[in-house]
Amino acid sequence: MDMKKIAAFSSKQEAVCVKNDTIDDALFEKYGVNRGLRDINGKGVLTGLTRISKIVSFTSGPDGKQVPCPGELWYRGYNIKTLIKELGENEFGFEKTAYLLLFGEKPTESQLIEFQDILDESRSLPTNFTRDVIMKAPSKDIMNSITRSVLTLASYDESSTDSQLENSIKQCIQLIAQYPMLSVYSYHAYNHYDNDESMYIHRPRKGRSTAENFLAMLRPDQKYTALEAKVLDVALMLHMEHGGGNNSTFTTRVVTSSGSDTYSAMAAAMSSLKGPKHGGANIKVVEMMDDLKEHVDNWEDRVAIKEYLMKILKKDAFDRSGLIYGMGHAVYSMSDPREEVLNSFVEKLAKEKDMERDYILYKNVEELAPEAIAETRRIFKGVSPNVDFYSGLVYKMLNIPPELYTPLFATARIVGWSSHRIEELIGMNKIIRPAYKSVMKEIE
């Protein structure tokens, strides 16, 4: 295969594609197309109904008009802030919340014990799977490695294409339990073969929470503090679910509506989540903040920090995209409740990790970025930090490598994907097929 020849042809054809595939923005306005399935205010086009979660970002004013309000996130009728607040000091919430999202009701004590036991039993991979699938084809792109593993797991399942509800529930539970292993083992394989680091495979232990197992499998000595495990558990809870309209969950429902199997639906969702506009934003926040540290000597100098942020917005700094990563959200306007919850734990972790200077810098950017954006952009709703703003800092303080940031997101979000797959299977009667209007010119 002559790659230079193929690359040269592709480069030549790029301009042809741009010429023939560019559609005038005016046509989208003419035909009333909501690009990205969202209106000018960022509100999504209504495409379905769900009982799994609810996002609140607007409320009715005195005149009946919708006005922005502090953001709220509800799981199966329960406010996420309440779910986290109700946890005991040494109690983990991932498993309890997963049960709630999957089955629509809080588990009793006996139901939770049974569910935790099922997850423990499912925390294993087929014989030699780690060696034959994960270790033999390592990749720096851990999301690709996990996606490949998910599709390969179908080969070990005699009922892989059976999309009946009972079988799909079983498959979803197994994948939820296996995702931490797929993520961590894929990273270790890459780190060994690409970075020439030591290779070690720690097995998950029964009785440990998902957060505890993740940290133990990742670290050479398997050690972690109670606060580290608690903060990671909270982060996982906050990332589990975010409505049916987010890109990866909608992808799950689209693929499910076609009658496809669980493994294919989850692999498709993974392909969506790995996109930098969806699951990769927290990495960009960390990179942006690292760049800021290099260009601003005094991390408490708010004037210098704001000047740097203005340079970013003018495309004169960082990646020259004009974006301050971690600011704003497609749905929330006044506040992102997930960011508020995570923020309440960040300061404690920063003290434990002796990273208080980093935390102060983040707080300054959190306060100054909305001001800078308001001064340079025409905005249709408020701008506030989203969950990605602090999640990257949390993972950095937990010594989780950047290659695992998005896979960790997936480890949580697969619970939401599974819940929506189940709901789609129960209520499915039509394949999802939105309309596209052709503006092609006929050539005789």
What do these predicted ranges mean?
Residues M1-E444:
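Non-transmembrane, aqueous-exposed alpha-helical and coiled segments at domain scale
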